[in-house]
A protein has these predicted regions:
Chain A
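An acidic, low-aromatic, low-complexity terminal/linker signal
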Residues: 1-179
Length: 179, 849
C-alpha cells in the first residue's frame, strides 16, 4: 500500500525525457574487459580463506566468510571457460547478490565506472562462441574497444544449470586443459 | 480487516480448541463444576461478542449451544448424544470462523439443523431441581464487560480461568524467529572472539569476555525457551480425537497423557502433530481390541492409550503405549515374505523387534479390512519418514496380548545443533552429532579393522559389517596420509541404516548454526548446509542421509519392496552391447546400435589439432575422443568406435575391444560421473555404460547445438527419493534426458521458467498437490497444453485410470513395472516428430536471438 501522492520509479529504467544510458562497472579478466551493471555491484573485497566445495560446479571456487556472511565465490575466468582447472586463484572479488544468494565474482582487476550511451550499443557479432555469448547481455562500442556487458542472470544461473543434466562447463574445462 | 474482528478471531480460535477438549473430559467426569463453568464462559463470550460485532449466524449457533451447556452446568447429565451435538456445533463455529478469517464476512447459509438438534438435546437433558444457578452472572444477558472482544472478563468468579491464563503477551512468530536468528549470529561472533583471544594472554580483556560469553549463552538459552511450548498444546486435541476414533470403531478407549508440561520448540510441535495423530489412529484401529475380545482375554473392557512426553539427554522422548493385542508377529513375517521384503531364511534369523520394524516399510499393512481409519497401506512408513526428516528416530516394542509401545525421540530444536568437526584430506566438515553413534580408531591393536571387499571399504564392528564412505575418495581430495592406521571411522545411523565415514581426525565438537546452501550448491545431496566456525572459517555440513545415498544405501533400502516374482512377466529385453577396455577403470560398454563402424587407426595417423585428436575417416576429418582420460597413446594400432551423429561422425578411442555380447541391460547404479549412464552387471562383472552424448558434446559441440542428436527430455516428478533414484536411470537407459523434481510445485516452477520438456512422468500420490491436480495445472501452462503426461501408480486399477483420464493424463504405468513405463513413454512420444519439433524450435530461437 503506497501513500497517496507517491510514485514508484523503477531505478533500473531511465526516467522519461533523459538520454538513455547505462552505467557500467568494468572488470578485467586476462586481456579482456567486461562491464557489469553498476546496480548489481555491492562491494569489492579481497577474499581469503576459501573453503572448497567438493563435488560442486567447477567454476565455484568455494565458500568465503564475508563479514559473517557466507558467500559463494565464482571465478569469472572459469565461468568463461578460459582457465584450466589448476590455475592459481585470484583474490580480488566483487560482491554481488543474485536471486537471494550472495556471490563473490573473482576477477583479475577492476576498472572504472563508465557510462555507455545507447547510441554506442552494437549488435552481437554473430560468430562469438555461443557459450560465451550466452553470458553477455549487450555490447558497447567504446573509444578503447568493444565492451561486452555480463548478464548477471546467466553468469549465476547455477540453480538452473544444476537441475538440467548437462554440465557443459565441465566438458569445456576438461578439453581445454588437455593441452 | 477490522481490528476488533481480528482480535476476536485470534482469541476465539484458542478458546474453542480448549472447549472441545474440556467437553470430552466432561463426558467422563460430569461432576467437575469448575470445568462446566469455564466451558460455559467460553461459549458465552463468543455469543456476546458475536452480538457486538453483528455476526448473526454465529450468534444464533452460539446461543443454542450456550443454552444446552447452561443446562448441563445447572446439573443435567451430559449424555453422549448431547456432547456429540455440542461438538458438532463447535465444529460449525470453527468453520464459520475460518471463513470469517478469510473473507471478513460470515459465509452464506444457516445452521437450522444444528440449532434444532441443540434445542432437542436441551429439552432432552433433565435438570434436577436441587441445583440452583451458581452465580447471577451466568444467566444474565451479556454485560458490557463480556462484549469486550479481546479478553474474557476476569472477575472474581473465575478462579479456574485465572490460574490457567498467566500473564502473557502475544508475540508474532516472525519476531521470535528474528530474535533467534540474531542470537545465532551473536553466538557465532562470540565463538570467533573466543577463538581470537585464546592465543592472547591479555588478562584485561579476558574477564569481560568471559562475562560476555556467559551472557550470550544465557541469552541463547532464554530465547530458545521463549520458542518452547509445552507439548500439552499438542495433547489438548487428542481427547477429542480418541473419542471420535473410539465411536467410529466401536471400542472403548481411555486416553492418558503424561508430561504435558514438557517443553519443546514450537516448530517441532507442529511437525510431530501429524505423525502422533497417525500413531494414535493406528492404536485405536489395530492395537485396541473390541470390548468383547478384551473381556474374553480377561482385560478391562476399555482399552487405554497412554501418551507420555519426557526430557532425556537433550532429546524429547514421546511414547505412545496401548494395552491392546500387540503386533501379530507371524502375520507380519508372512506378509514381509509375501511382498518380497525378505526371504524365508532371512526372516527366520530375525528377532521379533526386527520383524516389528517391517511395519515401517512403505505400503506395508496387515489390516485385513480397509477402514477410513487405517489399513490403507499408507501409514507407519510416512510416520517414520516424518520423524526422521526432523532428525528424530522411532522404535517400537510389542508383546502379544499385552500391547505395543511406540517410542519417538526428537531433538529439542532444529536451529542450533551440536556437531562434530571432522578432517579429511586437509579439509574440515561438520557432522551433525545427532546421527553419530561412535567414532572408532583404526590404529594398531584397535579392536576394529577396516577391510576392503572388491575395492570397497567396510568396517567390521562387533558383529556388524558396515559400508564405509572414504571422504577423501568421495570428494576427490588429495589424501596426505594414506595410512588407515592414523584414521578414524565415524559410525553413523540414519533411521535403520548404519554406515561409517572415514576421516583423518575429529578436530572439535561445536554448536553450529545450520544455514541452508544457496541455489548454486543446493543440488549437492551430501551437504545439508554450511556454517561459520569459531575461527571464522566456513565449513560445509555433511548430510548423513545424503552420504548414505552416496554409498548406495537408500533410506528405504532395507525395506526395499520388490514386486513378488511374477512368472508371467516377460523376460528382460536383450541389448547387443560392445564391451571394451579404456583406461584402468572397469570394463566399459556401449549399445552396439550406437556404433556404426569399428576402425583400427595407428597412432601416427592421429593428429593433435586445437586440443582435439583428429584422424582421416572415409576421406573426411573426424574428431577422436578418448573413452577415458587415461587411454594410452602408443605406436600400436588403436581401436576406434565410430559413432554417427546426424551425418557427421566422431571416433571414440579405446584400448581394446573385449567382446560383443547380447545381454539384458539393466542399469543398477545411476552414473555419478558425466561420462557414464550408470553401472550394470554384465556376466557377473560391473561394467560402466558410457553416455555417448557426453563424448559427442566434446567432439562435436555444434552437432548437439544444431539438435541433430537431440534426445527427448523427460521431467520426472516424485516426492520419494527412492522412486526418483530408481526411475531416473530407467528412463535414462531408455535414451531419454531426465530432469527430476521432488514436488509438483518445483516442477511447475521449472515449466513456468520456460524450460521445455517432451513429456512428464509423475507420481499420482504426492503431498500438497497430487498427480492429477498437477496434470491439470501443467496443461493450463502456456505451451504445455498438449504435453503428454504419464502417471505412476502403485497399481493401475480402474478408478486410477478413470481419474487419470479425467485429468488429461495420457497413460498410467505401475511404479515397479519398468517395461510398462518405457512403453508408455515411447507411445506418448511416438507422435512427436523429433526432427520437426527441433526445426520449429530452432526457427523460434533464431527469431528470438
Amino acid at each position: 500500500m503506497s501513500a497517496p501522492g507517491t510514485r514508484q520509479f523503477d531505478s533500473t529504467k531511465p526516467l522519461p525525457g533523459l538520454q538513455i544510458e547505462r552505467r557500467c562497472f568494468t572488470v578485467v579478466d586476462g586481456d579482456e574487459m567486461f562491464g557489469l551493471p553498476v546496480q548489481s555491484v555491492q562491494t569489492i573485497f579481497r577474499i581469503e580463506g576459501v573453503t572448497p566445495v567438493p563435488l560442486g560446479p567447477a567454476d565455484v571456487e568455494g565458500l568465503v566468510n564475508l563479514r559473517g556472511r557466507i558467500v559463494t565465490a565464482v571465478s569469472l575466468k572459469r565461468r568463461l571457460a578460459k582457465a584450466p582447472l589448476d590455475t592459481a586463484r585470484g583474490t580480488l572479488a566483487i560482491g554481488i547478490e543474485h536471486d537471494g544468494e550472495n556471490f563473490a565474482l573473482i576477477v583479475d582487476d577492476v576498472g572504472d565506472v563508465i557510462t555507455c550511451e545507447e547510441s554506442a550499443e552494437i549488435a552481437r557479432p554473430p560468430h562469438i562462441d555461443p557459450a560465451r555469448a550466452r553470458l553477455t547481455s549487450a555490447y558497447y562500442r567504446l573509444d578503447g574497444g568493444i565492451l561486452p556487458i555480463l548478464d548477471m542472470k546467466a553468469v549465476f544461473d547455477f540453480a538452473e544449470r544444476n537441475r538440467s543434466t548437462g554440465s557443459a562447463h565441465l566438458n569445456t574445462a576438461i578439453t581445454r586443459s588437455d593441452q | 480487516m477490522d481490528e476488533l474482528l481480528k482480535d476476536f478471531l485470534t482469541e476465539t480460535a484458542e478458546q474453542i480448541e480448549a472447549v472441545g477438549t474440556q467437553l470430552v473430559l466432561l463426558e467422563r467426569d460430569p461432576s467437575d463444576a469448575a470445568m462446566i463453568a469455564s466451558i460455559f464462559r467460553l461459549v458465552h463470550t463468543i455469543k456476546g461478542t458475536c452480538g457486538f460485532l453483528g455476526l448473526n449466524r454465529l450468534g444464533q449457533l452460539a446461543h443454542a449451544a450456550e443454552t444446552l451447556i447452561g443446562r448441563i452446568r445447572d446439573g443435567a447429565t451430559p449424555t453422549p448424544d448431547a456432547v456429540t451435538v455440542i461438538l458438532a456445533a463447535i465444529d460449525r463455529i470453527k468453520a464459520v470462523l475460518a471463513e470469517l478469517e478469510r473473507t471478513a464476512q460470515e459465509p452464506e447459509g444457516d445452521d437450522e439443523d444444528l440449532v434444532q438438534a441443540l434445542e432437542l438435546q436441551t429439552a432432552a437433558v433433565a435438570v434436577p431441581a436441587r441445583h440452583p444457578p451458581a452465580t447471577a452472572l451466568e444467566t444474565a444477558p451479556p454485560e458490557p464487560a463480556n462484549t469486550e472482544p479481546s479478553r474474557p472478563a476476569r472477575t472474581a468468579e473465575e478462579p479456574a480461568l485465572q490460574v490457567r491464563r498467566p500473564e502473557t503477551i502475544r508475540v508474532a512468530v516472525g519476531a521470535l524467529e528474528r530474535i533467534m536468528l540474531l542470537v545465532s549470529e551473536l553466538v557465532l561472533a562470540r565463538n570467533q572472539l573466543l577463538e581470537l583471544t585464546r592465543r592472547q594472554s591479555d588478562d584485561t580483556i579476558k574477564a569481560p569476555l568471559q562475562r560476555l560469553s556467559g551472557l550470550t549463552s544465557d541469552l541463547q538459552d532464554a530465547v530458545m525457551r521463549a520458542r518452547m511450548q509445552p507439548v500439552g498444546r499438542l495433547f489438548s486435541s487428542l481427547p477429542r480425537l480418541v473419542r471420535e476414533l473410539a465411536s467410529e470403531v466401536g471400542k472403548k478407549i481411555h486416553l492418558v497423557t503424561e508430561g504435558a508440561e514438557t517443553e519443546l520448540d514450537r516448530q517441532l510441535i507442529e511437525l510431530i502433530r501429524d505423525p502422533l495423530t497417525h500413531m494414535i489412529r493406528n492404536c485405536a484401529a489395530h492395537g485396541i481390541e473390541t470390548p468383547a475380545e478384551r473381556l474374553a482375554a480377561g482385560k478391562p473392557e476399555a482399552g487405554t492409550i497412554r501418551i507420555s512426553a519426557s526430557h532425556e539427554a537433550g532429546q524429547i522422548t514421546i511414547n505412545v503405549i496401548d494395552d491392546g493385542r500387540g503386533l501379530d508377529i507371524p502375520r507380519i513375517r508372512q506378509k514381509a515374505i509375501a511382498v518380497g521384503l525378505a526371504g524365508d531364511a532371512e526372516v527366520a534369523r530375525m528377532s521379533n523387534d526386527d520383524i516389528c520394524r517391517f511395519i515401517f516399510a512403505p505400503g506395508f499393512s496387515t489390516a485385513g479390512a480397509v477402514t477410513s481409519l487405517s489399513g490403507r497401506g499408507v501409514g507407519m512408513d510416512v510416520v517414520r519418514e516424518n520423524i526422521e526428516a526432523i532428525g528424530g528416530s522411532i522404535s517400537l516394542s510389542s508383546t502379544l496380548g499385552q500391547g505395543t509401545c511406540f517410542s519417538i525421540k526428537i531433538p529439542l530444536t532444529l536451529a542450533i545443533a551440536p556437531a562434530l568437526i571432522v578432517q579429511a584430506g586437509g579439509h574440515r566438515f561438520a557432522l551433525p552429532q545427532v546421527s553419530v553413534v561412535e567414532a572408532v580408531g583404526l590404529g594398531p591393536g584397535a579392536a576394529h579393522t577396516l577391510e576392503r571387499v572388491q575395492g570397497a571399504k567396510v568396517l567390521r564392528l562387533r558383529h556388524e559389517v558396515l559400508p564405509v564412505a572414504d571422504l577423501c575418495q568421495l570428494f576427490g581430495l588429495a589424501d596426505q596420509a594414506n595410512d588407515w592406521d592414523a584414521k578414524l571411522v565415524v559410525v553413523m545411523r540414519v533411521g535403520a541404516l548404519s554406515f561409517g565415514i572415514l576421516v583423518s581426525a575429529v578436530a572439535d565438537v561445536q554448536e553450529i548454526v545450520v544455514k541452508p546452501l544457496g541455489a548454486s550448491l543446493a543440488h549437492l545431496s551430501v551437504f545439508s548446509g554450511h556454517t561459520i566456525l569459531g575461527d571464522g572459517s566456513v565449513v560445509l555440513i555433511l548430510d548423513p542421509a545424503g552420504l548414505a545415498g552416496s554409498l548406495g544405501l537408500q533410506r528405504t533400502s532395507d525395506y526395499n519392496v520388490t514386486a513378488p516374482a511374477d512368472l508371467t512377466a516377460p523376460a528382460l529385453e536383450r541389448t547387443r552391447l560392445i564391451l571394451f577396455r579404456a583406461g584402468s577403470d572397469p570394463l566399459k560398454a556401449l549399445p552396439l546400435s550406437l556404433v556404426s563402424r569399428i576402425e583400427s587407426v595407428a597412432s601416427d595417423r592421429l593428429t593433435q589439432s586445437d586440443g582435439t585428436l583428429i584422424t582421416m575417416h572415409q576421406g573426411r576429418l573426424m574428431p577422436v575422443v578418448p573413452a577415458s582420460p587415461d587411454v594410452a597413446l602408443t605406436n600400436n594400432l588403436h581401436p576406434i568406435l565410430v559413432v554417427s551423429v546426424g551425418g557427421e561422425s566422431m571416433g571414440l578411442l579405446v584400448d581394446e575391444i573385449v567382446d560383443i555380447i547380447e545381454e539384458p541391460l539393466e542399469i543398477q547404479i545411476a552414473g555419478g560421473a558425466d561420462d557414464i549412464v550408470g553401472t550394470a552387471e554384465i556376466r557377473g562383472e560391473a561394467v560402466d555404460v558410457l553416455d555417448i552424448m557426453h563424448f559427442i558434446r566434446q567432439a562435436r559441440p555444434h552437432a548437439e547445438l544444431r539438435g541433430v542428436a537431440r534426445r527427448f527430455k523427460i521431467l520426472l516428478v516424485d516426492d520419494k527419493l527412492f522412486f526418483r533414484d530408481m526411475l531416473a536411470p530407467v528412463l535414462t537407459s531408455g535414451g531419454y534426458v531426465v530432469t527430476v523434481c521432488a514436488s509438483a510445485a518445483d516442477a511447475l516452477a521449472l515449466l513456468q521458467r520456460g524450460i521445455a520438456f517432451d513429456a512428464i512422468v509423475t507420481d499420482t500420490d504426492m503431498p500438497e498437490m497430487d498427480g492429477y491436480r498437477f496434470a491439470e495445472a501443467v496443461h493450463e501452462q502456456p505451451r504445455c497444453g498438449h504435453l503428454p503426461i504419464i502417471a505412476l501408480a502403485a497399481h493401475p486399477t480402474a478408478p486410477v485410470l478413470a481419474a487419470a483420464r479425467a485429468s488429461g493424463i495420457s497413460a498410467v504405468a505401475g511404479k515397479f513395472d519398468r517395461r510398462a513405463l518405457l512403453d508408455a513413454v515411447r507411445t506418448c512420444l511416438s507422435f512427436k516428430d523429433l526432427a520437426n519439433t527441433e526445426l520449429e524450435q530452432r526457427v523460434l530461437t533464431e527469431k528470438a536471438a
